[in-house]
């Protein structure tokens, strides 16, 4: 039988999914031979003190993966500046929901990265390395190929692997190898991320408005999300739906598209992005005085926006980004020998249900479990490549339905958020 140290695994991407898988394989009693490829440089531990987004890890998903990595005691020691309080307001400032949940502890993205990295040997991850090409498994050898190049190198390297795991995010190079796998589509939403420093020191009324955790305000095709992060800073995100533009709204209403099946193909991110200035002063003027944006919203909400934008450096360039997702159908993609995907590569979704990272980490746990079964033993009449393929099919039979459920919930929540009474709808969902 082929030992785990004898078959090679390539993990493309060192995000939450890739690092979770690397941590699980490291914790295994079996000596898995894996290499992680990541374009970024290794994050410095001091980055845990930088403001960033927070994640609520959920039972049976992200938390279960952390426990399986053997990192739960360390996880509990991480103090988050963001509590589990959730507030929902309408555009008039009316509080529709205000509650502190249990069982979904918050952790910053940077802290999660450092936690997972602490459990993976340094030599297992090739930082500053770009994957240039991925080739599917060859029928004769049963191995696929990864072509990579260090950012400081002048030549590339080609290596063969028995298993290639795509953990490489939204525009996955691994996904592109699978002929039937769809590419991301525009969800209809563009987003802007800002940071408000010294919240607790200087802006007491905004401190009270945001609360101890996450504040969501919905109305008129727009969503404002404010969330506490490190060192008294708030992360303020604007999620603007293309239909906040009257012309787009009219086109959507006359298109006859059934939103339940996914985004309308007539939506074009550029029609919204092209209207948004990049200078803080100009963007502030547009958002606070134009009725298509926040001019009619309550004074306290506009004050939050005004202060946040004034706090941006005068020479800052504020760039809005389109938010993409994988289509709800067709899903899942066709199985391919020697290749498997986890996280956004497998099921890119918007953040409207908080499921993306949670399902990504659950993917890695399910895949690691199948590889453990493979390591324990297989039928003596089955070749290693057939046994590996059987393990990958077993993983997909678990992961795909779970991802499909999360994708549907996420899309449903996006539609609710931008419905005529979105704030009330979201409040009702959280109450239930």
UniProtKB/Swiss-Prot annotation:
The glycosylation sites are 33
Specify whether Flavoprotein is a keyword of the entry.
Answer: yes
**Where is this chain's protein located in or outside the cell?**
Membrane
Major location (coarse): membrane
Which keywords accompany this UniProt record?
FAD, Flavoprotein, Glycoprotein, Membrane, Monooxygenase, Oxidoreductase, Transmembrane, Transmembrane helix
Pathway the protein acts in: Secondary metabolite biosynthesis; Alkaloid biosynthesis; Mycotoxin biosynthesis
* Enzyme Commission code: 1.-.-.-
A GO cellular component term found in this entry reads: membrane
Classification via InterPro entries? FAD-bd, FAD/NAD-bd_sf
| MF terms (GO), sorted A to Z | FAD binding; monooxygenase activity
UniProt KW Glycoprotein keyword: yes
Q: What does this protein do?
A: Monooxygenase; part of the gene cluster that mediates the biosynthesis of penigequinolones, potent insecticidal alkaloids that contain a highly modified 10-carbon prenyl group. The first stage is catalyzed by the nonribosomal peptide synthetase penN that condenses anthranilic acid and O-methyl-L-tyrosine to produce 4'-methoxycyclopeptin. 4'-methoxycyclopeptin is then converted to 4'-methoxydehydrocyclopeptin by the ketoglutarate-dependent dioxygenase penM through dehydrogenation to form a double bond between C-alpha and C-beta of the O-methyltyrosine side chain.
Q: What is this protein called?
A: Monooxygenase penA
Q: Which organism is it from?
A: Penicillium thymicola
